[in-house]
From Swiss-Prot:
Binds to 23S rRNA. Forms part of two intersubunit bridges in the 70S ribosome. Belongs to the universal ribosomal protein uL14 family. GO terms for biological process: translation. One of its GO terms (cellular component) is cytosolic large ribosomal subunit. It comes from Buchnera aphidicola subsp. Acyrthosiphon kondoi (Acyrthosiphon kondoi symbiotic bacterium). SMART domains: Ribosomal_L14. InterPro entries: Ribosomal_uL14 (IPR000218), Ribosomal_uL14_bac-type (IPR005745), Ribosomal_uL14_CS (IPR019972), Ribosomal_uL14_sf (IPR036853). This is Large ribosomal subunit protein uL14.
Amino acid sequence: MIQEQTMLNVADNSGARRVMCIKVLGGSHRRYAGVGDIIKITIKEAIPRGKVKKGDVLKAVVVRTKKGVRRPDGSVIRFDGNACVILNNNSEQPVGTRIFGPVTRELRNERFMKIISLAPEVL
């Protein structure tokens, strides 16, 4: 469950290390975002010479949450931290060319096939 002011790790090679959620997109007064939801983020920590820089405001898709995601069979997949993949503001395609760490199968339903294909492991 990601809400405003939540700090997330970045699971791609866009150059950002830590980001903060500033808005959960999808409906007015929506409070929480889960895996597969798009959020508006600002870069809080970035590496030198990356594709993004500190202070940039972009969109991102949540790929891992500590809260986890419940499957129809009753199982829950949880992670050690919250992570997102930074998206281009216009095309909503990933900015980075590599994804680090596992992602969940729920992204397939949310039309993020590019992230699924780049990920090293899909749970």
